[in-house]
């Protein structure tokens, strides 16, 4: 591939970071990845083609990692996420997120020119910032300069309210890195919907009844304004909930198509896919509208 960027993708998942390189039309070749989840591995290979897998990051021998120009290491977020257990990333703590520290030996041995990391913004929160800085100091001792910033996907053409911290680290002398400017975009859920989603994503009539009952209790006028609005928004448009207020959770929320999705998380069977309303909503006629989950492709 000539001067293609050689990439190693640790904590690869389904390969979203190498996918970004494809979208940006950056000539590259993934020379190895590291992933242990069998379904993620299957998805990765289907999307990107068969790729050498280094396996468990905690068992990788640094000298056996192929030389690379870019190493990505977006480690598990569960121990730093506000919805997780907050056990942190302290070296030697044994938490999922502390797997980060197994990257240290690999980076020291291979010294890629570029490093890329993405994680939840709470990594910069008061409970975790100290250990994050310790990691930054390690990279600086190897000769890297670190640039990090919290970015929101909705500012870059993705209809999802998703704030994440990104860190780019560059080895040796270089022109100072600048993160992309915010884009003036108005992409909303409506823009990414499939034309003919499978019937299995549509909710049962009982859910529609509960939705209407709760809307009437909360006041229909505001909901109707949101449903009928055609103005695009860079915010989530929360129309109502299928569940009573005391059970109010993301699982029951119905969102407007003219806004952005809430932050997507791993569903783990929790019925937490964002749900939208379709059709000409008439609260007196159940057949005037449908409620459905976003499909995996839409997510």
Task: State the predicted function of each range.
Residues 289-299:
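FAD-binding beta-loop-beta segment adjacent to the flavin cofactor pocket
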Residues 8-10, 72-73, 116:
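Structural recognition of the beta-strand scaffold that forms the well-ordered cores
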Residues 8-58:
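SAM cofactor-binding core of SAM-dependent methyltransferases
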Residues 2, 60-70, 80-269, 278-283, ...:
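Class I S-adenosyl-L-methionine
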Residues 5:
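Nucleotide donor/acceptor-binding cores
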């Amino acid at each position: 591939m000539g001067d293609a960027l050689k990439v190693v993708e640790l904590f690869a998942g389904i390969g979203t970071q190498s996918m970004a390189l494809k979208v940006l039309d950056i000539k590259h070749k993934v020379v190895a990845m590291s992933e242990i989840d069998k379904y993620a591995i299957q998805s990765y290979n289907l999307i990107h083609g068969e790729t050498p897998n280094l396996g468990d990051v905690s068992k990788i021998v640094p000298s056996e990692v192929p030389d690379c120009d870019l190493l990505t290491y977006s480690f598990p977020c569960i121990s730093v996420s506000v919805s997780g257990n907050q056990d942190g990333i302290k070296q030697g703590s044994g938490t999922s997120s502390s797997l980060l520290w197994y990257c240290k030996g690999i980076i020291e041995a291979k010294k890629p020119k570029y490093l890329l990391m993405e994680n939840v913004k709470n990594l910069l929160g008061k409970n975790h910032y100290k250990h994050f800085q310790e990691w930054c100091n390690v990279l600086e001792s190897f000769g890297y300069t670190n640039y990090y910033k919290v970015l929101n996907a909705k500012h870059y053409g993705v209809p999802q309210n998703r704030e994440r911290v990104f860190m780019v680290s560059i080895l040796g002398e270089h022109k100072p890195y600048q993160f992309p400017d915010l884009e003036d975009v108005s992409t909303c859920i409506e823009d990414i919907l499939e034309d003919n989603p499978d019937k299995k994503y549509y909710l049962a009539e009982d859910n529609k009844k509960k939705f209407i009952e709760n809307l009437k209790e909360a006041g229909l006028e505001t909901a109707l304004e949101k449903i009928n609005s055609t103005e695009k928004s860079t915010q989530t448009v929360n129309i109502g909930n299928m569940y009573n207020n005391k059970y109010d959770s993301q699982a029951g929320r119905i969102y407007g198509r003219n806004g952005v999705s809430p932050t997507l998380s791993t569903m783990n069977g929790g019925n937490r896919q964002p749900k939208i309303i379709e059709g000409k909503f008439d609260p007196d006629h159940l057949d005037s509208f449908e409620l459905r989950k976003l499909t995996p492709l839409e997510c």
